[in-house]
Amino acid sequence: MRQHIICGIDVGNSAVKTIIAGVDREIVRPQIMGIGSVPSTGLRRGAIFDMEETINNIGDSVNQAESMAGVKINEAYVSLNGLHIRTQLSRGVIVVSRADNEITQNDIGRVLDAASTISLPPNREIIHVIPKSFTIDSQEHVKNALGMKGIRLEAEVLLVEGLSPHIRNLAKCVNANN
């Protein structure tokens, strides 16, 4: 069976670390294939102050991990951290779209979008929406609303937000390494 390759990159204040793992359906845990770690010389307090250094640090860390793993990666999960990251709770509500009142994946997407529609300053953006629970016609604390029946669907979510310039700068540094 062919392994699915995943990669994670952590760009921190003190080091840039990369891990490459192989995952297949028969193995419960990912198998570590390669790691890379180099000192971080372009970040301070979670913010990039030298893009060229950060680009080089990411490239060096990824190259170490690729060399150890014997594979070339083309996508990665990248950590985003720093003092600019904030969270807040939000709620959204919609009317279920189907005539038979069965909640679909589309309804869940719509209610999550409704919960994500908040006023943010122009320099901040939502990074992630984490559903906490749903309420269906006053039935609270529903973990998975898919396939259930109801007229009114509410969602309580945790919104993770950050400063847009920091997010874009990190993405630019990662993407510069192809």
Give the label of every model feature segment:
Residues M1-A15, I19-N178:
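Nucleotide/phosphate-binding catalytic cleft detector across ATP-hydrolyzing
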